[in-house]
Every structure is written in C-alpha cells, then in structure tokens.
Amino acid sequence: MKKFNLLLFFLLVVVVFGSQGTLIFKGTDQYNLFLGRNLIDGRTLFIANTAIPEGFASLQVEQPTVKTAAVTNTFLRVTPQFLIHNFEPFKQKGWLQSVVPLYLRYRYDTLKPWLVLGFESEVSDNITGFINLDIPKDYRSYISHGDNFDSKPYMNFPVELFEGKLEALDMSWPTFGYVSYASNNFYASLGRYKVAWGPMRNGLTISDASSYYDNISSSYTTPLWKNGRFTYSFLVITPTSLLNEEEWVKQGKVWDLNQRRPYTEGAKTIIGHRFDVQFSTWGRLGVGELNVVGGKHPDLNDANPFIIFHNTYGEDFSNVMASLDLSLVPFKGIELYGEIAIDDVSFGSTEAGARGKPTALAYGGGLRYAMDIKGTLLLASVELYHTDTWMYNRWQPLLTFTNRIYTKSELPGSRDFTDYPLGFKYGSDLNGFSIMANAIMTNGLSISFVYEHFKQGEVTLKTPYLNMEEPEDDPGEFTAPEDWSGPVGETVNANILKLNMMIPYRNFTFGSDFSLYFGDYFKKNGGYEKPIFEIRPYLSYVF
C-alpha cells in the first residue's frame, strides 16, 4: 500500500501533462518523485541527463503512456512574493562586465516572477510545445536597491511603476520555453531551459546552475544485454558570444604554444556527446565529451553528432573536456554515485612545457537515500566536491567552460554579464560538500533543506588563465604543478543554508523560502562581517 500511494501521486503529476514530449527537470518535485520511486524499487536510472522526456520516464518506470488530444492550455500565474532580508545594496556597476558574485545571481534566479503567461500545447501523443512569458523584477533593483542604492526591495513586484518609472518593467525575459518530440526510444528538443549531466545534484560537467541554456538536445535508447539499456545523447548549447572591448583584445591574440592564429568571429558553441550504459537494473556508467568552439562558427568537423573527440587539435578555436560518471544501487533505496570531469591532463609532448596547460580536474561523489513513509517520499543526499585550480578556465574568453548570459537593467542602469560555470556552480579552486533532504507528501506539500559548504582559493574564473596578462608573459602565481590541485593562496569559507516549503491548494500555491549565508567568503565578496539572511513568502494563483 505504501508503494501504491507513492505511485498514485507520481502518476497524478505526470497525467497532468500527458504528452510523451513533456520534459521533467532536475531539482523539481516531479523529478525527485521519479528518482525516489526508482531507488525504492532498487533501480538506477538508465539516463542521467536532464531534461528527461516523459516518454523515457514511462519506459523507466514500466508504465504505459497516456493518449492525449491535441490542445493548447493557456494559463496566467500571478505570484506576489515578499522580501525580508538584511542584504546591503550591491553598488558596483557593470557595463558589459561580469562583476556580480555568483551567490547574488543565484539569489535573483530563484526569485519568483511576479507574472507568467504560459501556453502549453500537446500537439500529439509525442510532441509538446511550451511558450512561457515570465516577467521578473528588474535585476539591479533587487540586488542594488534602486537608482540611488536606497530603495530596499520588499516584494518581487516592480513597485517603482507607481512612481511613473516604466523602466522598472524588466524586459530580460523569457527564461523558459521549448518544443519537444519523444517516444519510448527517441527524444529531440529545441528550446531555452535548464540542462544537466550526471547523477550529482550539483554536476561537475554540465550543471543546472545556469538560469537557462539555449540548446538543442537529442537522445535515443535501446535494450542492451539481458536487463540493461544503451542510451546515446547529443547536445548543442549556444551561450551569448558578446564580449567587452578588453575581452575582444584578448581573443585576438595568440596565446597557446600550439595555436596558429587567432579566431575572432562572434560565436561560441558548446557541443556535447554522451553515452550511458545501464549494464544492470542496479548499475549505470556514463561517458561524455564536451567541445567548446569559440571565435568561429562550428562546421561538421566540430559538431558531428556521432564523432567523439579526445582532442580536436584545434587549439586556435577549440577546448575539449571529457567526463565519466557511475551510479550503483546496491540495496533498495540507496544509491552510490560519482563523477569526474577532465579538462586537461599534463603529460606527453602535446601538453609539456612551461606554458603548457596544467592538469585540471573536477571530481566528486555522493550517497543518496530514498524511502516511503506512509505515502510520503523522503529523499536525502550527501555530496563531496573538488575542482582544481584552473578548471573551466582558458586564455581566450570564448573558450572558457562557461555559459554567459546578458542581463539589461535600468534601476540603476547596467548591462551585466553573468558567467555561469558550465560545471560546478561556484567554479574552480575549491573543496566542498552539501547535504540535502526533501520530503514530498501525497497532498502536494513539499519541504526541502539544503546545506552547502565550500572552501575556495584565490583563483576564480575571473583570474587570467595561468595569471598571464599577455601572451609573452611567463605563467604567474599558482601555476607550478604543486599548485594545480588547489585550493591555493588565501582561502575563504562559505556556508549556505536554505529551507523551502510549498503546498498547492486548488488554483493556489502557498510557499516560502529561507536562506542564510555566513563565512569569510561573503566578507571578501560583499563586505559582510555578520551572517546575511532572506525570507521570501509567496502566494501564487493560476487563472
């Protein structure tokens, strides 16, 4: 009966959407229910990528898909959210620069949009289209407290409109939308949404830390051996290729010993290939490869869906990373998993020399536990992380493993770049761990707790690669082999605690989140001597 209650709730969530093309995203209650149910049954997922289509999800849980009629459902969601916090205004202006600390951007990304107009189209049993017009609060009015840094925000609605300031109406939307086709064995989508690779909650190769990725994704899956599956995935991401004047100068220089000439077209493309081998219902191995092509538009040599590179030998315009991850379910309800991302390994003639690229790895592992308590799903995990000193970095701005997003603000006026790390959410040169617990009840009540801690050295993604300001420079500080693993220099500690609660009732959703930040990391990146907190209760209604 316990499993039946959990299964019933899971099916109710899925049936709302119907089409096999509807996508499920990591970190949502729907995904956690999907993941938890499989762990309770002693199964690992045959694909560790998200978004995952419901066609694949129905295959994973061995449930038939639901036939649907072609229809478009329109909704209008209004969400007033109130803000109680002791954050100081962030006063450093950015004009085509990445100056805002990542924790402040992540804080903004989780703020509810005050108005969402959505069109969800079930085109057929296999095709879903989703158009989402989400209007958020102006970015800088939230983190910088208005034009004069003295208008402390108290809600997500642009109250400055009542003062006649039409510029308070943020126009940096939308952040979500897609069209997707899926069956039980094939999936393809085009859109703007969160993407993630691997089993870790905070991924090291591609994480869902970015507010979105503009991407094309595709996968196919087939039975393998007696109880396994083989799944192949192809991905193309196109971050903004906007650079500021200083970055264009760096992009136009020859840095690499193997580089023949600079490539300076306004283009950056991230191409990913990955296969997952589920060798048994209790085990899965994933192998992936990412190729960042920058300064030129990719051709079929760069973006062939079925050619996987160790090295493109395109040092002028290419940066390649490999990944390996493993998931094991030795007992029902327990999952052991790990991931390693390999940017560079310094050995042999291709990497040797004083100005060769250093070894740069990111690796981590975790333990996940799921159980059903009288119809309530409890999902908990502990994860450990390490990123090397120069991970995700590169001389040429268009070859870093980052997803740049451009945000336009008017209160105060700013044109901000946010360079989200493609992998671990806080970047390079650190050790960290996290604890997560999520309880989801049959009435829809969801409570989650997350604690994250990391110790970071002096090298970040804003640090010039190998501390070289010019190509003729010798590598600077923290570039000797003994410094490659990090953290290096003067380290700082960060502690982030988050508590979220949400319960739906008919067309209403009631919820709140609480965040607490403390540690000398926030003194270095914000000047905070004492802990900082934020409480954000909200009420959402769907028309």
Task: Tell me the role of every PLM-derived stretch.
Residues 10-18:
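Hydrophobic h-region of N-terminal signal peptides that target proteins for export
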Residues 149-161, 468-487, 522-527:
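Flexible, solvent-exposed loop segments that connect beta-strands
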Residues 26-284, 352-361, 365, 376-383, ...:
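Outer-membrane beta-barrel channel domains
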Residues 19-27:
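Cleaved targeting-peptide boundary
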Residues 1-4:
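Positively charged n-region of N-terminal signal peptides that target proteins for export
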Residues 195-196, 213-415, 419, 428-435, ...:
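Signature for the C-terminal beta-barrel architecture of outer-membrane proteins
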Residues 492-523:
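C-terminal structured domain segments
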Residues 503-506, 530-543:
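Outer-membrane beta-barrel "beta-signal"
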